[in-house]
Swiss-Prot record:
Sequence positions that bind Zn(2+): 67, 69, 150, 409
Protein name: Alpha-mannosidase E
EC number: 3.2.1.24
Native species: Dictyostelium discoideum
Topology versus the membrane: Single-pass type I membrane protein
Recorded family membership: Belongs to the glycosyl hydrolase 38 family.
GO MF annotation: an example: metal ion binding
A cellular component term, taken from the record's GO annotations: lysosome
C-alpha cells in the first residue's frame, strides 16, 4: 500500500471517529449530575458575547415541577412505590431546609390531569371536584391558577369549566407546532381564551403558553453534561429568545419533566450554581428578579403588569414594545400536530371498548350518588338508618376517585401500555361491583318503608341485584321486581330492553311472560326477540331480548313485575317475534311515527323519509377500513395506506318485526357453528298506541339505531360513513364538546386524518341551501374521532389496531384486536326542531335507565314508584349532578342546555318549579363548580382584547351565541325553616323562596343540607323494631365478568389486554446512526478495495491471456515453418 492510500484511509477513520463522538454527545441524556467550579474568565467571555435581553427589565419565575402520570408506562401503584413517594419525601425535605425553594405539585388541583378530547364534561368536573375537595379538606387550599401541560390538544370547554371553578389563569403546552410558531412570532403566547360565545366574559381566562415543552431548557437540565459556562450561556440565550415571543416582561421557565426530582437534592444543587451566577449579574441582563416560584406567583405578577400597562397611554407602551390589548381566542386547539405526518387524531378512537366502559361506569356512579343522597334525605329522622348508610360513604368516595383516575390523559385516551390499561379496567370493575352494592342498599332504604314488617327484613327477602341476564328457568311460580332508575330531571317515556334466559325453546312458555307496572297493576305491551336462532350457540342458547315502553318519574324510580303467567285466564300482552330469513336486505322497510327507512340489498341504510316534513333523502350508509403502517396509539396517518370497503356482503339476514321494534340483523363470517366475525343490527322503535297527529313521538322514535359488533383487524382503522345525497354543506360540519356544538371546516389541502376532530356526543351536518333547512345528526355512545370528507358525508372512526408504534412515548404497538359492541343513532329533522331537541336526545342516549332486580314473593311495605321532585325540571334545565359530600352536605348542579325555541326564550321564563317534594333542605348556597366558595375573576373584564383574524386556526368556534338571551328563572320553594340566601324573600305560608337564574350553556352549582328532624329521630335502642340491614358483597365477580355490553351482543365483554412490560424492540436510532456513520465509509472503503482487487485481477487475467495468445502465435509460426 502506497503512502497516498494510507493517508486516505486514516482520514476516513478520523472523520468517522469525530462524527461518532458528536452523535454520542447529542443522544446521551443520562449522564450523572456533575458539579463544576466557577470560572470567572469564562463567565466574562459569556457576558461579552451576549447583549442585553430586552429594554425592559425581566422578572423570571423558575417553576420546579415533576409531571407524574397516574398511569402510562407503568401502573399507578408501581409509579408511587418506585418513584413518586421518593419525589415527595425529597421535595418536602428540600423545602424545609431552604425557604427560597418552591415546588409545584398537583398542577390543576384535580385528581389527575384529564384528557380534553375524550373525557366527558361530567367526568372532567368529577375529577376536578375530587381533587379540589381533597385539597380543601386536607390542606385548606383552594386552586386559583392551573397548569394543564400534557393533554394532546385543548377543548374550548376548558376555560368555561375552569373559570366556573374559580381558576383565573391557565398554562398550556401541547399546541400544534405550526400554531405555536405563529403565536411566538405574533407575540400571542399570552392571550385571553373565551370558552363560550353564550357566556362571554364569564367563560374567559388568562392563558400563558409554554415556548417549547414542560421540560428543562436544554443547557440547564441537570442530567445533561454541560459545563457551568455552557449552562449560563445557554440559559441567557434561552431567556432572550423567550422574551421575544411575548408581550410581557414576566417570564416563566419550567424546571422539570416526567418524574423528575427523585433525587431532589442533586437537582436543586446543579440549578443553584448557574442560578447564582445569573443572580450576581442581573444588571448586565436587565433582569429585575429571578427566583424559584409557584404558578400563583407567576400569574399574579403577570396580571399586575398587564393591569399596570393597560393604564398607560399607547405612546408609553410603544416605548417598551407592549401592545395595549391582548389577543382574544374563541376556538379550541384541535387537532394537535407535531408535523405534517403527525396529527394526533388516532387517540380519539383508540381502545373503543375501554372508552365505552368508562362512560358506562360513570353513569352507574351518577345513579349511585343520586340514590345514596336521596336515601340519606328520606331517612333523616332515623338515626340508625343514617348511621348504616353512612358506612357506605367511604366506598362511594373511592368509586368517584376511580372514575376520576381513568380520566387521565393516558387512560381514557387508551395511550398507556396495555397492562396499565388492564389495571384501570380492573379498578373500574371493582368500582362497579361496589356501586351495585351501594345502589342495592340505597334502594332498600328508599323503597322499603315498612320497617316493622319482618317479612321484608328476614333472609327470604333478597336484595336488589344487578342482573345482566334474568334467568327465568323454572320460575313459573315466582316473579321479579324490576326497578328502573331515571338519572334525568325530566319524566321519561321510552323504550327499554333487557335480556332473559329460559330453559328451553318453548314458544308457549315465552308467550306466557308478562310485564306489569306495579303502581297501576297494568299489563304492558312487550315484544320478545331471540338473540340467536342457531341452537349450536350454547352460550346464548334460549337468550331473548324483551322490549317494553316504560314511564319513569323525574330523578325517580318505577317498579315493574316480570313473571311467567300460569293462569290460563290471564292474557299477557306479549308478542313473540319469529325470525324471518331474508335473501337480501332490501326486501323489507322500517316504519314508525317519525320515519320510513329503506335498505340496500346488503342491509345498510339507503333512504329515509321524515314523516313530519315529508322530506325524502337518499342516505348511503357504508363501512370502510383504512390500511396503514404509519399509525400508532396517538397518531392516525393515512400516508401510504388505502381505503377499503368493509362489511359489504353479509352471510345471513334475519328480520324481526312487532309492535315495538323492527329489527334487521346481518351476520358476517358465519361458520358451521355459532361463531361470527361481525354483526350489524338495524333497529327502529315503534309505538303504535299513540295518535301521531295529536301526540309527540317518544324520544326513542326519533332516531334509527345501528348496532355493530366488530373485532379489531390488524393495521386497520375502521369507520362507518353516512352520506346524504345532494346535501350542500360547504365543507362545514359540527361536533359537540359536551357543552355546545363547535363549527368545523374540512380543509381539502390536508389529508383526511388531519381533518379529524373529537366527538363526545354527536356530529352533524346542516344544509346551507335556501330551500332546505334540514339537519342530519349521528349520536355516539362513546368518545370517537370524526370528520366530513365530502359534501353530505359524516365519517366516524369506530375501531383501530396496529402492530406498529408511532414513537410518541408508549413505545409499544396498540394491538387491540378485541371485540367492540356499540350503537350509533341517526336523526334527520328541521334545524329549528333540532335546536330544541339535539342536546336532550344526546342526554337521553347517555343517561339510559338503570335496572335492578329483586326476586321475592312479597312486596308489602315497598314503595312502587318514587320521585324526590315535585315536578320535572324545565325542558332546558338538565340536572347534571346530585351527590353527597363530606358531613352530609349535598351538592347540586344544574345545566341550561338551551334546548328551547330561541324566538320565545327571550320573552318568557321557563316553568317555575319547586325542588324537592317532601324533603326539607337548609343552607342553600351557590358555589363554584367544584362545590367550593364562589369566586369571581375581578380582572377578566378589565383586559382590553382584540381578535386576530390571521390566527392559523380557522374553525372551532361556538355554533350559536345566546349572549343576549334572557336567563332561565327557576323558583325553588320549600316548607319549614330554611336558611337560604336571601332568606327574607318569603312567599305564601311562610315558605322560603329562592330564584335562580341560569344563562344558556351555563352550569350553576349549589350546596345544601337536608333538615334532620332531631326531635323525631328514633333513638338507637333495643325498643326499636328490626332495622334494615346493609347487604354486603352480594354481587359476584363472575356476574360482572359475564356481562354483555348490549342487548344484541353475542359475546360477553372481553377486553384484549396483554403484558407489554419492558422494552419493545423498536428501531434503535442511535445504533442506526452509528451504524451508518461506521458502515457508510467502511462500505465505501470495502467497495473501493473490491473494485481495485477486481480490476487488478481482470488486468492480470488480460495480461496473462495476451501472453498465452502471443505464445500460441509463436508456437504456431514455428510449427508452420518446420519441415
Amino acid at each position: 500500500m502506497n503512502k497516498t492510500k494510507l493517508i486516505k484511509i486514516i482520514f476516513v477513520i478520523g472523520v468517522w471517529i469525530l462524527l461518532s463522538t458528536f452523535i454520542i454527545n447529542i443522544y446521551n441524556e443520562n449522564f450523572e449530575i456533575v458539579n463544576y467550579n466557577n470560572n470567572s474568565q469564562s463567565l466574562k467571555k459569556i457576558f461579552q458575547l451576549n447583549g442585553d435581553l430586552k429594554d425592559e427589565k425581566l422578572s423570571i419565575f423558575l417553576i420546579p415541577h415533576s409531571h407524574c402520570d397516574s398511569g402510562w408506562l407503568q401502573d399507578y401503584d408501581w409509579y408511587y412505590n418506585h418513584v413518586v413517594q421518593y419525589i415527595l419525601s425529597g421535595i418536602v425535605n428540600e423545602l424545609n431546609l431552604d425557604k427560597e425553594k418552591k415546588f409545584n405539585w398537583v398542577e390543576i388541583g384535580g385528581w389527575v390531569q384529564n384528557d380534553e378530547a375524550t373525557a366527558t364534561i361530567d367526568d372532567v368536573i368529577t375529577q376536578m371536584t375530587q381533587g379540589h375537595q381533597w385539597l380543601k379538606d386536607t390542606l385548606n387550599y383552594t386552586i386559583e391558577y392551573a397548569w394543564q401541560i400534557d393533554p394532546f390538544g385543548y377543548s374550548s370547554s376548558t376555560p368555561t369549566i375552569f373559570s366556573s371553578m374559580g381558576i383565573k389563569g391557565l398554562i398550556i403546552n401541547r399546541v400544534s407546532d405550526d400554531v405555536k410558531s405563529y403565536m411566538k412570532s405574533a407575540k400571542e403566547m399570552e392571550f385571553i381564551w373565551k370558552g363560550s360565545e353564550s357566556l362571554g366574559e364569564q367563560s374567559q381566562m388568562l392563558v400563558s403558553t409554554l415556548n417549547v415543552h414542560y421540560d428543562y431548557p436544554k443547557h440547564i437540565d441537570p442530567k445533561k453534561d454541560f459545563s457551568l459556562e455552557e449552562r449560563v450561556k445557554g440559559f441567557t440565550k434561552y431567556i432572550k429568545d423567550l422574551s421575544n415571543t411575548r408581550e410581557s416582561s414576566i417570564l416563566m421557565i419550567p424546571l422539570g419533566d416526567d418524574f423528575r426530582y427523585s433525587n431532589a437534592k442533586n437537582e436543586f444543587s446543579v440549578s443553584k450554581e448557574w442560578l447564582k451566577v445569573i443572580q450576581d449579574n442581573k444588571e448586565k441582563y436587565n433582569i429585575k428578579e429571578i427566583k424559584y416560584a409557584t404558578i400563583d406567583e407567576y400569574f399574579i405578577a403577570l396580571e399586575d403588569e398587564f393591569m399596570n400597562k393597560l393604564g398607560k397611554t399607547v405612546e408609553e407602551n410603544l416605548k417598551t414594545g407592549f401592545s395595549s390589548t391582548l389577543s382574544l381566542y374563541n376556538k379550541d386547539f384541535f387537532p394537535y400536530s407535531t408535523g405534517d405526518l403527525e396529527y394526533w387524531t388516532g387517540y380519539y378512537t383508540t381502545r373503543p371498548l375501554l372508552k365505552r366502559l368508562i362512560r358506562e361506569s360513570s353513569l352507574l356512579q351518577k345513579s349511585s350518588d343520586i340514590l345514596y343522597t336521596l336515601a340519606i334525605g328520606e331517612n333523616s329522622n332515623n338515626q340508625i338508618d343514617i348511621n348504616n348508610l353512612q358506612t357506605l360513604s367511604n366506598q362511594l368516595n373511592e368509586n368517584r376517585n376511580t372514575i376520576a383516575l381513568v380520566q387521565h390523559h393516558d387512560i381514557v385516551t387508551g395511550t398507556s401500555r396495555s397492562f396499565v390499561l388492564n389495571d384501570n379496567f380492573q379498578r373500574l370493575q371493582k368500582s362497579r361491583i361496589s356501586n351495585y352494592n351501594i345502589i342495592s342498599n340505597s334502594l332498600e332504604y328508599l323503597l322499603n318503608k315498612d320497617n316493622n314488617n319482618n317479612e321484608n327484613t328476614d333472609s327470604t327477602n333478597e336484595p336488589f341485584n344487578f342482573e345482566n341476564v334474568i334467568d327465568l328457568s323454572n320460575e313459573i311460580n315466582n316473579q321479579y321486581s324490576l326497578v328502573f332508575h331515571n338519572t334525568l330531571g325530566w319524566e321519561v317515556n321510552q323504550h327499554v330492553s333487557f335480556r332473559i334466559k329460559v330453559n328451553k325453546n318453548d314458544n308457549q312458555l315465552l308467550e306466557s311472560i308478562q310485564l306489569v307496572e306495579a303502581i297501576s297493576n297494568k299489563t304492558i305491551q312487550i315484544q320478545i326477540i331471540p338473540i340467536q336462532d342457531d341452537s349450536n350457540c350454547q352460550s346464548i342458547e334460549n337468550n331473548y331480548i324483551v322490549f317494553a315502553i316504560i314511564n319513569l318519574p323525574p330523578l325517580g324510580l318505577n317498579t315493574y313485575y316480570l313473571s311467567i303467567s300460569s293462569n290460563e285466564d290471564s292474557k299477557p300482552n306479549t308478542i313473540l317475534s319469529k325470525p324471518k330469513l331474508l335473501k337480501k336486505g332490501n326486501e323489507i322497510n322500517f316504519n314508525n311515527n317519525r320515519f320510513k327507512v329503506e335498505f340496500e340489498s346488503n342491509g345498510l341504510i339507503s333512504k329515509i323519509t321524515d314523516k313530519n316534513s315529508n322530506e325524502i333523502k337518499t342516505i348511503e350508509q357504508t363501512f370502510h377500513q383504512y390500511s396503514t403502517k404509519k399509525s400508532g396509539p396517538y397518531i392516525f396517518n393515512v400516508k401510504g395506506g388505502k381505503k377499503h370497503g368493509f362489511l359489504e356482503n353479509p352471510d345471513k339476514f334475519i328480520y324481526h318485526d312487532g309492535p315495538l321494534v323492527s329489527q334487521l340483523t346481518m351476520l358476517y363470517g358465519v361458520d358451521d357453528g355459532c361463531n361470527v366475525t361481525s354483526i350489524v343490527v338495524q333497529r327502529i322503535y315503534k309505538n303504535n298506541e299513540i295518535d301521531n297527529s295529536n301526540s309527540k313521538s317518544l324520544i326513542t322514535e326519533n332516531y334509527i339505531e345501528t348496532g355493530y359488533s366488530i373485532n379489531g383487524d390488524m393495521n386497520r382503522e375502521t369507520t362507518i360513513n353516512y352520506k346524504v345525497k345532494d346535501l350542500e354543506n360547504d365543507d362545514i360540519f359540527y361536533t359537540d364538546n359536551g357543552l355546545e356544538s363547535r363549527k368545523r371546516i374540512y380543509n381539502h389541502d390536508r389529508t383526511v386524518n388531519q381533518n379529524y376532530y373529537p366527538v363526545l356526543g354527536y356530529i352533524k351536518l346542516k344544509e346551507t341551501s335556501e330551500n332546505n333547512n334540514h339537519q342530519y345528526t349521528v349520536y355516539v355512545d362513546r368518545s370517537v374521532g370524526a370528520t366530513s370528507p365530502s359534501d353530505g358525508e359524516m365519517e366516524i372512526m369506530i375501531h383501530r389496531t396496529m402492530d406498529t408504534d408511532d414513537w410518541k412515548g408508549v413505545n409499544w404497538p396498540s394491538k387491540d384486536i378485541g371485540r367492540s359492541d356499540a350503537k350509533l343513532y341517526f336523526n334527520m329533522d328541521l334545524v329549528n326542531n333540532q335546536l330544541q331537541n339535539e342536546k336532550r336526545i344526546s342526554l337521553h342516549i347517555t343517561n339510559q335507565p338503570i335496572m335492578f332486580v329483586k326476586k321475592h314473593n312479597n312486596q308489602t311495605g315497598y314503595l312502587l314508584k318514587y320521585s324526590p321532585l315535585s315536578n320535572q325540571l324545565p325542558s332546558n334545565i338538565h340536572l347534571q349532578s346530585l351527590l353527597t359530600l363530606k358531613n352530609n352536605t349535598v351538592g347540586l348542579r344544574l345545566f341550561n342546555i338551551h334546548e328551547v325555541d330561541s324566538n320565545t326564550q327571550s320573552t318568557t321564563d321557563t316553568d317555575k318549579s319547586t325542588l324537592f317534594n317532601e324533603l326539607e333542605i337548609s343552607n342553600f348556597i351557590e358555589t363554584g363548580l367544584s362545590f367550593l366558595k364562589l369566586t369571581k375573576n375581578n380582572l377578566i373584564d378589565k383586559y382590553s382584547t382584540r381578535i386576530n383574524k390571521k390566527f392559523p386556526v380557522k374553525c372551532g368556534e361556538s355554533e350559536y351565541s345566546f349572549i343576549n338571551e334572557k336567563p332561565s328563572s327557576i323558583i325553588f320553594s320549600n316548607n319549614g325553616t330554611n336558611n337560604i340566601i336571601d332568606g327574607e324573600n318569603k312567599g305564601e305560608n311562610n315558605k322560603t323562596i329562592e330564584t335562580i337564574q341560569i344563562k344558556p350553556h351555563e352550569i350553576k352549582s349549589f350546596t345544601f343540607n337536608f333538615n334532620f328532624q332531631l326531635d323525631q329521630i328514633i333513638p338507637n335502642n333495643n325498643n326499636y323494631a328490626i332495622n334494615k340491614e346493609l347487604n354486603n358483597e352480594y354481587i359476584e365477580q363472575s356476574i360482572e365478568n359475564q356481562r354483555y355490553e348490549y342487548d344484541f351482543s353475542f359475546f360477553p365483554i372481553k377486553p384484549t389486554f396483554y403484558d407489554d412490560r419492558g422494552k419493545y424492540n423498536r428501531p434503535n436510532h442511535l445504533a442506526l446512526i452509528l451504524s451508518l456513520s461506521i458502515g457508510t465509509p467502511a462500505g465505501i472503503l470495502i467497495i473501493v478495495i473490491a473494485l481495485v482487487v477486481i480490476y487488478k485481477k481482470r488486468k492480470n487475467r488480460k495480461t496473462l491471456t495476451s501472453s498465452y495468445s502471443l505464445l500460441n502465435l509463436i508456437l504456431k509460426d514455428r510449427a508452420d515453418s518446420s519441415p
